[in-house]
Regions:
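C-terminal regulatory
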Residues: 1-92
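A late-sequence structural motif
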Residues: 84-116
């Protein structure tokens, strides 16, 4: 997408670009208010209820989209267009059974989640 249409240099430039969005039937994402303020409805060219489909649409060059940083980290084909805003952060709670909390498998998973 960037090779064909260029990269927005500011938030104001976003109104000149195509975007991938979340279907309105999905509960509001943390970044939805930013979309509502900065992306004209006519520039949202693809909607999905699935994060996996949204990510694939961005990878396929259909438009720009909001993706978790960890899902594209280390992928040379993906370019971070703008830094994430603090308001987009999502808190993740990991709950375990108290008898399993100290097991190696659970600790490994908690370590992986905390690295994200």
């Amino acid at each position: 997408y960037i090779e064909q249409y260029g990269q927005p240099s500011s938030t104001a430039d976003c109104s000149d670009h195509n975007f991938i969005g979340a279907d309105p039937s999905v509960p509001k994402r943390t970044w939805q208010a930013w979309y509502d303020q900065n992306v004209p409805a006519k520039r949202i060219v693809f909607l999905s209820t699935s994060n996996v489909v949204i990510e694939q649409a961005v990878r396929d060059g259909i438009g720009l989209g909001m993706l978790p940083v960890h899902s594209v980290h280390g992928n040379p084909d993906m370019i971070q267009v703008m830094p994430p805003e603090q308001a987009w952060n999502v808190h993740l709670w990991a709950v375990t059974h108290r008898d399993l909390h100290r097991s190696a498998k659970v600790q490994a998973m908690l370590g992986l989640l905390s690295a994200i």
